[in-house]
Amino acid sequence: MGVTYQLVGTFAVEPILARLTSGQLPDVSGFRSIVGNEAQLAYWMALSWSLAAFVEEIAYCGWVLTRCAEIGRFSKGAWVGGASSALFGAVHAYQGLSGVFATGLTGPVFAGVYLVTGRNLWATIVSHGVLDTTGFVMMYFGVYPGI
């Protein structure tokens, strides 16, 4: 799931969002050091799996999603999806407006994985880690747009 979502997001969703928002793809220039550099690839993947995949999913699916569901019992689907997506996207503001929207769309995907798997956080953690790993490997080989 992570590989497919990364590829579709990178080559289809992000260009469309860029045209609809700022006209620019998400700013991933902070990751240029990864291109052709195994040490940087390993460094960013370690950070990604520990902080992005593990911590973000525990925070967003494990805590925010559950709290939003408790607050918005009367309209769980829309409330939970909107609130968790907005927060998930906002954390990625360093990528610019199109990056905020792109990651905001990722929020409901991970929330869906979490709910479909019976609230299994490991399913979202692994999906998030695989998605980020795919992106970093694309950056390493210099094929990620904007890198």
Q: What positions do the PLM features span?
A:
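Juxtamembrane helix-loop-helix connectors linking adjacent transmembrane helices
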Residues: 1-52, 70-73, 145-147
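Functionally important transmembrane alpha-helices
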Residues: 82, 98-147
